[in-house]
Structures are given as C-alpha cells and as structure tokens.
C-alpha cells in the first residue's frame, strides 16, 4: 500500500522548469482547466453535510469528499480507483483532488476584468484609446458606444448618451450599430488589428512633436507590442467564462451548533451565480431592456467584487460589516499568499525558551535543556533505540521515551554528540541572528548562551527568548557546521571588525587587571619570568596593580611561518603579566602592556585574527572572557552614591551663567537684541556652562594625586568605580556621568526645540518637581520614538533587501579597466576616514605609481590587504582608483574582483556569495540605532554657520583645488571662482585638511607656501557677496540714475556714502527696463576686456547691491566693485538619522534643490518675468544656448559674464542626486550617496563598509533611458535594463550594425524593486495587483534569476551552496539547447531570442 502511494506521488510530480510565464487566459483555456460548470449557488446540505449537486462544492465536478469513496457509497476502497459511479457521477479517487480541480461559470453576458480596467494605467483604456471614465460609463450601462458606424457621420468608439442614441436611431435607422456594456467593449477590442496598428504608430512616432502626445503614443505602442509578441489577444481582458477555485482552497467548515464557518470567497461566488442565473432567466423571458441592463450591471459588479473587492465603489461587506476578502486580497499584503506562505513558512523540529548566561561554555557551545533536547531529537532517538535492539518497534521506542527510562538519556547523549543546532533570536536583522552551536545538555528549562555572541544577536538576559532549530539531513548539518557555527562568524559582515568582542563585565575585569597603581604592594620587584609573577600574585606578595619589571619571551612568526624567540625585560604591572599568560604565541606583549579598554581589546582580537587565524582567535576570545569575568568579580567594582563626586566649582559656574542670562534678558528688554537672538544666546550660555561643569567633574573624577615612593606627588588615574566603567567602555559614558554628578543640562521639548531653562541639578542631588516635569517631557518622547523607529527601520531593511536580492558573485573578473577614485575623507581640519580604511580589501583598478616616479608600486588587480595598505601609507599615496561594483561589467551579478574582500572571512569573495542581501542587512541592521528626528539648529549651531575665515590646525603647505584667482594690490590672492577648496598638505604630500572657500576670499598666503599650525590663512565677509574686478582701470556707471535705479546712503557711524541699487520692484516705471551696471574702461575710455576673452568687462548689478566706488574712480585688480548683501540663509533643519538614509536611497528630490549648470558656458540674464529671472548659458563653441527660469528669491552664486562649468552650482541648496548623475556622471553620484549615508551612520558611531552602499547604488542604477535606438528593438525614451541594452549592443556591434545609446537613470529603491526583470519578486514586494496586471498583459516570463523568486517557487536559491546546483542545471540545459538547435529550427520571436542569448551569455560568464 505504502509503495503504491509512493508510486502515485511520483507520477504527479512536474519535471524541472526554467521559468514561469504569466499571461491572459482565453475562455477556451479556462474551460479546459475546468471539470464542470457550477450552476447552482448551493454549498452543502445542512442536514446531511453532503455537497449539493452542481453547487459550489459539487463532488461530481470537484472530486470525492472521502478518499476512494463515491458520494452515494456504492464504490469504496482502493480497488475501484478511477471508476466513475453511475449513480452519483463521482470519480473514485483521492480527496486531495478537491484542492486542484477547478470548475467554471459560463457568464450570460461578458464581464470586464476589473484589474485590466481599474489598475492604473487602465490597459483596456490604453488599448482602445478611450478615457477610463468613458469606458466605465459604457460598462456600467450609462451610455452607448458606436461599434460599427456604417455610412453615417458617427465615428467608431464615439460615446452616445441615451438621448443622442435615440436621435441617431431616428436619423440613420439601422445603418449603424451601437451597444452598451461589456459586449460593446469586447466588440471594440476584437476589432483591433494589432499588427496594422503597431506598424502605423511606429511610422508616425518620429513626426510627433508634442512631448505629451509622444509619451502617450509610446505607451500605447509598448502595450500593443506586448500583446502582439506575447500572443495574448486584447479581447481576453473581457471575461466570458469565470474560473471557480477548487473547493478545498475556500473551505466550508461546520461548527458545533449547526453554524458554518466559511471562506468569504464562497459568498462572493454565490452572488455571481445567483445574478448570472437570474440574468439567464430574464434573457429567456425576453424581459424589458432596462431590467436586463440592470441585471447585467449587477453581474459586472459582483464579478468585480469577487476579483478585487473595493477597487470600484464601496466594498461588499459580510454579515459582520467587514469587507469580504476577495481573490486579490488573498495574494497581496503581509497576510497574503506571497509574504505569509511563500516567503515565510513555519518549520517543525524547533523549540523556544528563555535564555540565560553560560559563562563556562566554550564559544561553539550552547546549553540545551534536557527536556527540549529529548523532544527535538525524538526521531533520532527512536532510530537509535531500535538499532540498539533496546526497543523492538517504533511504538515501543515511543513508550520508552515517554517514560524517560535511563537508557533514553544515554542514547540522547550519543545522538546529540557533534550534531549542531541553530539558535535564532527575533528580530533577525542580519545573518548573525541565526548561528549554529553544539548542544551541551543541562538541567533546568532555560537555554544557556555564550556571552560573547550576545552582541551579534543583540541579546540580553532580561527575559529574551530564543528559538532552537534542528538541521535534520546530513547536508544541513554540514552547512550548519561549516558556515553557521559561531566560531566561523568572528568578523562582522558589515565592517570586517570582530563582532565577538567582550563587553560590559569582561571589559571591566580586563581593564581593572591592566591598570597600574602607585605604591602598590610589591612595587619595584623584578621577576625572572611570567610564571614567577603568577606565584607572587597567588601568595599575595604582589598585588594586581603593582608596577614591576618582568623578563618576557616573545615568539615572532615570519610570513613564511618560521618562528623565532626573543627575550627582553619590560616595565609592566602584575595584572598585565597575568594577561600575557593567555596571549597566544606569536602576538607581541605590547598589545597587553596598556590599559585594556574596549577599543584596545577589539584591536587585540583583530590583530590576533589577521596574524594567527581563526582557531587561535576563538580559543583566545574564550580565555579573555573567563579571565575578564574572574577579575571583574575580584575587583568588586560597583556603583555607590559616594562615587558620584560633585565638583566644587559647579555652583559658581551655574551662578555665573545665571548672571549672564539676566544680562541678556535686560538687553532684550531694552531692545538691543531680538527674541530669537536672546533665545539662541541663552542656550549658548547654558550649553557652555554645562560643558565647563562636566569638564570640572571629569577632571575631579579621573585623576588623583598620590605621593610616590620617592616622595614626589604624581598624578594617577583614579580607581573610582563609575569612572572605571566609563573609561574602559564597559558601561556608561561621560555624558551619563555628567547627569549623575554634574548637571543634567538642557532638555528638549517633544518637537525637538530646546527648553531654555536647564536642569541645574544632577541625579545625586535629586530633582525638584519642576525639573522632574521637564525631564519627563524628553523621556516620553524617547519611548514613543523607539516604537516608531523599529517599524521604520524594518521597512527600510525590507526595501533594501528587495532591491538587492538578486546580486550574486558569479565570475572572477569582468575585466573592466576603471573604477572609483578613493581619497581620504577630510572635513575641515580633520581626517574623518583615512585612505587605508577606505581601500582595505578592495582591488586596484589602475596601477598605483610611486609618487614622483613612473615606477609601479601596486599593479592593477592587486587585492589591498593590511600589508599593502601599510606600503601605500609609507609611500604617502593620496588617492587610489579601486574597482567597484558600481562600475562592474558583469551582466547579471558582479565579479569577485570588483567586490574585493569578503568582509566576514578576510579573503577575496567566493562565487555564489549573496552580496546583495548581505549589503542590505548591513545597512538595515543598525537602522534601529539611528535617530528619527530632524535636528533643529538652535544655539551653538547657528553661530558656526557664519564662519568667516580658515584657521589651519596642522603645519604644511597650501594647495588650491579648482580655484581661479587674481592678485590684488597688496599681492594677496583673491579667489574669483565658485566651488573652490583649499587644502593643507604635509611634508609627505598627504592631505591633512580641506576647506571650502567662497568667491571673494582673500588669501593671506600664496599657493605652495608654508603655513604654520593655528595660522589664519583666508578671510571673507560672510554677510555680503562681493563682485571682484579682474582688471585695473576706471569705473563707468551704466544706467545708474540717482533716484530712478539707485539711491545714495550715508552710514551714520562712519559718514561714508555709498550707492545702493534699487530692487526692480521698488523702481518707478521709468527705471523698470533699465539695467544698472558697472563698466571698466582704460584711461582713454575704451572698454577693457576680461583677461583671456573677448568679453568687455561689464558687471550688471542686481537689486540691493551696494557700490562703494564712485563714477570714474580708479580701481585695481582684485578690488571689490560692489557688494550684494546675503540674507543669512534660513537655518534649514538638518534631516538626520533614519529619514535621511531613506531619502538618499529613495533618491528623493529635496525641497528647493541646488540649481546646477546644465552646460558649460558664459552666464547672462534674459528678460525677467514677474516672479522669475531668465538665466541663459551660452557655450563658447557657439552651439545651442540653454535657458532656464529661476525664481527671484533664489540666491544666485553667479553674475553676468561669468563662466561656469557643467554641473557647477548656480544657486545654493541641497543637491539632488538625479542632477548629479545627469551633469557630473556616475562616479560623482556614487561618491555623493556613499558619503551622505556614511555621515549619518558615522554620527551614531556605526561602521559600515562603503562596499555595501555601493552595492545598493548599483541596483539603483540598473535602468537606463534609451536616447537613440540604433538598430535595436528598443523605443526612444523607453526605460530598459542596462544589462539588456549592453547585451543587445554587443550583438549588434558583432554584426556591424549601429548600437543604441542610453543615459543611466537613478531610481529610488522602491521603484527599482518594482522595476526588476522578475515579476514574481516585484509582486511579492509591493503593489501586487499592478505588477501582476502588467506582467500578464505583456505575457512576461520570469527567468527565476534572483533569490526571492526561487524561494517562492520552492527551489534552492542560486547563491551559497545552491549556486553549484543552479550552475550545473544551467550547463545541462545549455547542452540540451545546443543539441536541439542542430536538429530543428524553431521560430522564435526577437524577445525570446534575446532572452535565450542573455541566458547563454550569463552561463558563459559563470563558467569561466
């Protein structure tokens, strides 16, 4: 019997497939699926519980209710398999056919499919070139549409209301034909001749001038071509036959008490059948038109509700007032088929329990409660018991296990040996959220977890729960052990740093051990070796912190693995000598001869991993942990109230601040400062007071003065518990200590603005009621934020995963010759990220030369590891061009060389590594640590914005970047270009600092001259924008008429008069057309030219410009001619944290973005309109000029006659990524996004490797716009996949034809996910209805290339260990295809050919 079932099972299995195609079903196809027509709305007979005949659950159509038994009971048992009972008509077979057999309903009148009607853009509307409203009016019987105009003046597709229809009937009789309802639409669709229409539209496309019309025609053409190539017929968008879902997929379950629980679909089907039957009856009776029409409309509405309830009109509700769940609702959303059942499934062999600490475990172990283990490993135990002969049958074994006999535990021990289990903690934000451990059986009911893996899980022991999963098959166990074992996941995939670093108690213990104390017991002793130190400590002769001399022996391991020993005497402490006992051979003693804070320990582990490899590191990490716990216990460090020492200066500092605030208040009342200034100043005062208090407090806490052996006072770090905890990095921070022992400081309101009365008390003194109330404000906001943040962060991660999920490493080297230029990140006077951190683990794209020679230092395709980075630093290399995934040339995936090092393993990345998902997780996982708020600039920040000079921090020489300058009369340089930057270079040629300097800056030093640290080298006026003269001569006023276009003003304080140009709005009508300007002339009155051009030196003056020279005054080079007052730019809120990251990845346009120059050329202004000015850029080569209207309130950085380069900033503002891509290219946009995202994460102290962000950017740049079509199939202005276009172009070039040209396009991650090649992946992400509608109309085929699609269809994913399976399958398929191709020539459409070719190329790529 068993074998027979097995055989039957094998029969029904489908063979392997390579793609999934979706299309429209024709009425015949629907009938061919069906096993019979459902004619009655009845479901089950409520007395007998048997399905009604020809009803929705009919056994004759859908199959038997019980296995191998017909409905009337005439045939039972297996022997009658396949017989159709002559009495009840039911086939005798398994009951599971009721899950797969479909029925159908023949509709009495055709019905439009709501998806193709209402899902925007309406496909039926596009096809017929009618508006959605018109079609709806036809479908819902409000007006007629002409189908056959005959010999009349009517046109086909014309709408007629009831009255006009009757008039036309009177006029023309039956010359013409007009109908209403879906029949009419069906006729219109049927009459379309696709091939003719396509031909005609392709011909008229080039001659269309209007942009909107062209877009519309292109859209329609695309739709028609999709129909044409896919073999779908337009009339199939109208249903004549409705398929009925198999009954077991919409079950009806009898509850006790004679009621039934039912799926909503049954209700919806019943309505359709009722209305359909009523309509049939009315048609048979030849009822009046109006009644039939009404019934047809109701039928249309009920089918709409069945397919997608609530898309049109109000949703149909059930008895309990909630809308019924239609077919569309079954598949979309979090609870729909895709996300609930296909992407996430429940698993068996799992258990969950609370976790507790397992401080005695090794890193690869976890403690598993016996009870859980027994339950989880039951099948293994049964098998073992039977094999041992302890139980005769499975049943007996089961009894033994239930009784928990003694032998069972022995067997369990054996089964568990070396059988890893997987532990998972929700939320699993990155791949370290599931790791494998070897179980150790323990008493009790809580899982024990090794403390060092807590950081990876983000777990703590305040009641967290974890799930245990058992890998069953041998392969699964192998993968768990080789890939997921906690000992194999030491480095974080996000940044390549160790993720197994001690924290909290362990750090405190190690820090305490390694501290030194003056006058410790045993100070000054000398020891022969480390073991002697141990004896001294154990016997109590020397204490842990005593300074001693020790002779140590170090092992040095050379690159070739040769070991040499060296001995030296070293000044150290007893504790550090003890630490060196656990130090693995080959590491230097200096690594522990320091105060071991968290950073130092992390560095120690990192060094260990890089020098000695995995095994030593794992053992060492465990030893560190045991030692740390031991000494943390011995130290007895705890928090007591006396540890919070309040500095004496606090009270005077607070009093001073209060006095200052009073003074400001008085100034405000006498009207000297504005309310805003007062507020900002008050906040500044308190912020600085707070700083001073906390500084005083930290100085007080951190050191104490001790008299040493020689009787000299010496400073030593304090052993205050709170200070030690913060200093070591175990817990707490200076900011928190400040609140305990300093003052709490300023608090924020929930809207982010700062309350100007600070809390001057600290927690030790205690808060009064008012202070407490202010505190609660912020605290409550924090809690609310956290809840929102989690949801937002999760959604960001989901979008990232979705956009990047199909990126896998598929070849070694794509051979591309360029990449991204990497420089150290310098902001102002600080190197934020040195070059080595940016290029570590990347591959060089172009040879790196030794500076000043043409000798190659690092050849192309070198993987830069730590040693190489040191070499680069020694030669003070300042920039390296490295390979990047953004420029990788592989078609469907990336190559290993462009990606570089696998961060979690430390070697070049393997084939099949799913870098897309890793990148998404690495960026999404820290999302919960980012803030949600936008920062309001208040107080300290608003002052810094108006800086007016550059003061350097390091000595070096001065370099200017893209700067034009002139020398003024004092020999100083004046900058006359926009985005200029000034850099300080040290003697090795490395850049140390970089500053932006605005137009009109006066430099105190010449280029390449030496500057000293702290020198001020550049000055400018932040409040006005000067116009600098580039030639010497005399000033000539043009159109400057006193009282018309300008006024004279005299400064009260200095008595100097100056000329102010009137704004256009303030002039009289006479002055409206005049354009005031300054012309520069020589002594003879001839125009001077701007150097290097034929342009006369004439400077047009905008409104409000202040001219300080008089007419005919002499002027020198570099002097300011006029000044334009700058309104201090409105303090913009900086969007910070998570929203900023989301905005960047969604490539959203900022409000009021910077305006960039579209082409290079000379600026001039055309005719102004009411609110805008016209900016014209004329290129030097005389080609087409470009003009743009700019609102007047925008502050322009340019004036007439100035030259700009393409992509330069014309008006300040946040830059839009799209503009950067268009005007400055891919490299710049990549740099921009990477740096901006990194800024947000850096602020929170989160390290993420640039690679991950680049991976996402690559996916955002997946699509391109076709600019010219060449000989390809693409349409101009069409959006296409870049890899597709590249493949098509390669073919064409091989055939000697013209390829298409394209512009890369930047899509936000949501848009990019929805635009993927795979409709299955897109549908399971968002907007399921729209995606599926579009795919069905185009008859799309999903090549199942990404990870998500393969999970959904239930295959191994084409990454990791599943990569090999897919590779071999594809190779076999290619063989079959090539052998088949020799025998028969099949007709293939262009798109299919292209797809096959793409697949083959893809294979070729993955083979080599």
From Swiss-Prot:
Zn(2+) 1 binds at residues 70, 72, 85, 88. One of its GO terms (molecular function) is DNA-directed RNA polymerase activity. Binds 1 Mg(2+) ion per subunit. Binds 2 Zn(2+) ions per subunit. Keywords: DNA-directed RNA polymerase, Magnesium, Metal-binding, Nucleotidyltransferase, Transcription, Transferase, Zinc. SMART domains: RPOLA_N (SM00663). SUPFAM superfamilies: beta and beta-prime subunits of DNA dependent RNA-polymerase. One of its GO terms (biological process) is DNA-templated transcription. One of its GO terms (cellular component) is DNA-directed RNA polymerase complex. Its EC number is 2.7.7.6. HAMAP family: RNApol_bact_RpoC. This is DNA-directed RNA polymerase subunit beta'. It comes from Shewanella frigidimarina (strain NCIMB 400).
């Amino acid at each position: 019997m068993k074998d027979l079932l097995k055989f039957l099972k094998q029969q029904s299995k489908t063979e392997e497939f390579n793609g999934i195609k979706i299309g429209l079903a024709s009425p015949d196809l629907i009938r061919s699926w069906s096993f019979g027509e459902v004619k009655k709305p009845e479901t089950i007979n409520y007395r007998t519980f048997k399905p009604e005949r020809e009803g929705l659950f009919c056994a004759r159509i859908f199959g038997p209710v019980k296995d191998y038994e017909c409905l009337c009971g005439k045939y039972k048992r297996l022997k009658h398999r396949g017989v159709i009972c002559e009495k009840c008509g039911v086939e005798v077979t398994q009951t599971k056919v009721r899950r797969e057999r479909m029925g159908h309903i023949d509709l009495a009148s055709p019905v439009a499919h709501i998806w193709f009607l209402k899902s925007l853009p309406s496909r039926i509307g596009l096809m017929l070139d009618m508006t959605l409203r018109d079609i709806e009016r036809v479908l819902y019987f409000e007006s007629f549409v002409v189908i056959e105009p005959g010999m009349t003046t009517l046109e086909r597709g014309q709408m007629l209301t009831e009255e006009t229809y009757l008039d036309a009937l009177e006029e023309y009789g039956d010359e013409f034909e007009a109908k209403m309802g879906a029949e009419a639409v069906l006729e219109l669709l049927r009459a379309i001749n696709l091939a003719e229409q396509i031909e005609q539209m392709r011909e008229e496309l080039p001659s269309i001038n209007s942009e909107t019309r062209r877009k519309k025609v292109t859209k329609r053409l695309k739709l028609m071509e999709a129909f044409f190539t896919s073999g779908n017929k337009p009339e199939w968008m109208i249903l004549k036959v409705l398929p009925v879902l198999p009954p077991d997929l919409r079950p009806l379950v009898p509850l006790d008490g004679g009621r039934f629980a039912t799926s909503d679909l049954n209700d919806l089907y019943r309505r359709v059948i009722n209305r359909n039957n009523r309509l049939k009856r009315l048609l048979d009776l030849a009822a009046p038109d109006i009644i039939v029409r009404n019934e047809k409309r109701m039928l249309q509405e009920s089918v709409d509700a069945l397919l997608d309830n609530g898309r049109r009109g109000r949703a149909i509700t059930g008895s309990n007032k909630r809308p019924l769940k239609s077919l569309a609702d079954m598949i979309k959303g979090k609870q729909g088929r895709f996300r609930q059942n296909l992407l996430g499934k429940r698993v068996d062999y799992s258990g969950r329990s609370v976790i507790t600490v397992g401080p005695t475990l090794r890193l690869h172990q976890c403690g598993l409660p016996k009870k859980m283990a027994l339950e989880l490993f039951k099948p293994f135990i049964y098998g073992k018991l039977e094999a041992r002969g302890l139980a005769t049958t499975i049943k007996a074994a089961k009894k033994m296990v239930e009784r928990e006999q003694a032998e069972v535990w022995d067997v369990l021990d054996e089964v568990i040996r070396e059988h890893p289990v997987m532990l998972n903690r929700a939320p699993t934000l990155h791949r370290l959220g599931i790791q494998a451990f070897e179980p150790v059986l323990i008493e009790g009911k809580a899982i024990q977890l090794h403390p060092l893996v807590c950081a990876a899980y983000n777990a703590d022991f305040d009641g967290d729960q974890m799930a245990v999963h058992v890998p069953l098959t041998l392969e699964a166990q192998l993968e768990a052990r080789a890939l997921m074992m906690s000992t194999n996941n030491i480095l974080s995939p996000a940044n390549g740093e160790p993720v197994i670093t001690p924290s909290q108690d362990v750090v405190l213990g190690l820090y305490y051990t390694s501290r030194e104390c003056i006058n410790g017991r045993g100070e000054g002793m000398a020891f022969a070796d480390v073991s002697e130190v141990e004896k001294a400590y154990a016997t109590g002769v020397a204490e842990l912190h005593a300074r001693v001399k020790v002779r140590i022996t170090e092992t040095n391991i050379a690159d070739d693995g040769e070991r040499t020993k060296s001995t030296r005497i070293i000044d150290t402490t007893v504790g550090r000598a003890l630490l060196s006992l656990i130090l693995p051979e080959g590491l230097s003693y200096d690594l522990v001869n320091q105060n071991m804070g968290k950073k130092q320990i992390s560095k120690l582990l990192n060094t260990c991993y890089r020098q000695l490899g995995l095994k030593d590191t794992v053992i060492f990490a465990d030893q560190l942990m045991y030692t740390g716990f031991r000494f943390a216990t011995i130290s007895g460090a705890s928090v007591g109230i006396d540890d919070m020492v309040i500095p004496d200066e606090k009270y005077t500092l607070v009093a001073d601040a209060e006095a200052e605030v009073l003074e400001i208040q008085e100034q405000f009342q006498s009207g000297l400062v504005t309310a805003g200034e007062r507020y900002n100043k008050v906040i500044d005062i308190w912020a600085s007071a707070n700083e001073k208090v906390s500084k005083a407090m930290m100085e007080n806490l951190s050191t104490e003065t001790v008299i040493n052996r020689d009787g000299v006072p010496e400073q030593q770090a304090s052993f205050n518990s709170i200070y030690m905890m913060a200093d070591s990095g175990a817990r707490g921070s200076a900011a928190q200590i400040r609140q305990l022992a300093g003052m709490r400081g300023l608090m924020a309101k929930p809207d982010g603005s700062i309350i100007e009365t600070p809390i001057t008390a600290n927690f030790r003194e205690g808060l009064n009621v008012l202070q407490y109330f202010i505190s609660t404000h912020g605290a409550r906001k924090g809690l609310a934020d956290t809840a929102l943040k989690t949801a937002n962060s999760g959604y960001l991660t989901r979008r990232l995963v979705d956009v990047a999920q199909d990126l896998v490493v598929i070849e070694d080297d794509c051979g591309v010759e360029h990449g991204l230029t990497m420089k150290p990140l310098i902001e102002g006077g600080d190197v934020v990220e040195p070059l080595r951190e940016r290029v570590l683990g990347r591959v060089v794209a172009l040879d790196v030369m030794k500076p000043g020679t043409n000798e190659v230092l690092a050849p192309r395709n070198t993987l830069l590891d730590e040693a190489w980075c040191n070499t680069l630093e020694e030669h003070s290399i300042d920039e390296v061009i490295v390979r990047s995934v953004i420029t990788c040339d592989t078609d469907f995936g990336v190559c290993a060389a462009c990606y570089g090092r696998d961060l979690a393993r430390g070697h070049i990345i393997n084939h099949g590594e799913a870098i897309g998902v890793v990148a998404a997780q690495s960026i999404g996982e820290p999302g919960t640590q980012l803030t949600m708020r936008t920062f309001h600039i208040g107080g300290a920040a608003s002052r810094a914005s108006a800086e007016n000079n550059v003061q350097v921090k390091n000595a070096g020489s001065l370099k200017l970047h893209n700067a034009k300058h002139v020398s003024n009369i004092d020999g100083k340089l004046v900058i006359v270009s926009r985005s200029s930057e000034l850099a300080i270079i040290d003697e090795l040629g490395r850049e140390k600092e970089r500053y932006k300097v605005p137009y009109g800056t006066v430099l105190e030093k010449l280029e390449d001259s030496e500057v000293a640290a702290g020198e001020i080298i550049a000055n400018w006026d932040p409040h006005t924008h000067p116009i600098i003269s580039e030639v010497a001569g005399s000033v000539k006023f043009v159109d400057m008429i006193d009282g018309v276009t300008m006024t004279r003003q005299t400064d009260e304080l200095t008595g100097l008069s100056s000329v102010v140009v009137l704004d256009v709005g303030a002039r009289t009508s006479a002055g409206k057309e005049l354009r005031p300007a300054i012309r520069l002339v020589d002594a003879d009155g001839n125009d001077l030219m701007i150097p290097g051009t034929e342009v006369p030196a004439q400077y047009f003056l905008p409104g409000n410009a202040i001219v300080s020279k008089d007419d005919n005054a002499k002027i020198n080079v570099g002097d300011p001619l006029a000044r334009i007052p700058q309104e201090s730019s409105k303090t913009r809120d900086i969007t910070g944290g998570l929203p900023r990251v989301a905005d960047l990845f969604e490539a959203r346009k900022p409000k009021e973005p910077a305006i960039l120059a579209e082409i290079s050329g000379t600026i001039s202004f055309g005719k102004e309109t009411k609110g805008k000015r016209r900016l014209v850029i004329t290129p030097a080569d005389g080609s087409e000029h470009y003009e743009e209207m700019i609102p007047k309130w925008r502050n322009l950085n340019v004036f007439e006659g100035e030259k700009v380069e393409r992509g330069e900033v014309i008006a300040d503002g946040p830059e839009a990524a799209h503009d950067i891509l268009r005007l400055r290219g891919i490299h710049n946009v990549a740099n921009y996004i990477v740096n901006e995202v990194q800024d947000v994460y850096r602020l929170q102290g989160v390290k993420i490797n640039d690679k991950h962000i680049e991976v996402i950017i690559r996916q955002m740049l997946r699509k391109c716009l076709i600019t010219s079509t060449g000989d390809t199939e693409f349409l101009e202005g069409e959006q296409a996949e870049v890899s597709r276009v590249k493949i098509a172009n390669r073919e064409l070039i091989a055939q000697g034809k013209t390829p298409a040209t394209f512009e890369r396009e930047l899509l936000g991650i949501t848009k990019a996910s929805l635009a993927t090649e795979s409709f299955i992946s897109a549908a399971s992400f968002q907007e399921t209805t729209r995606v599926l509608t579009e795919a069905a109309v185009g008859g799309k085929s999903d090549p199942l290339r990404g990870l998500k699609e393969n999970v959904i269809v239930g295959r191994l994913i084409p990454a990791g260990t599943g990569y090999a399976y897919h590779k071999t399958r594809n190779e076999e398929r290619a063989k079959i295809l090539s052998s088949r191709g020799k025998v028969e020539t099949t007709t293939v459409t262009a798109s299919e050919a292209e797809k096959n070719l793409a697949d083959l190329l893809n294979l070729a790529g993955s083979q080599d």
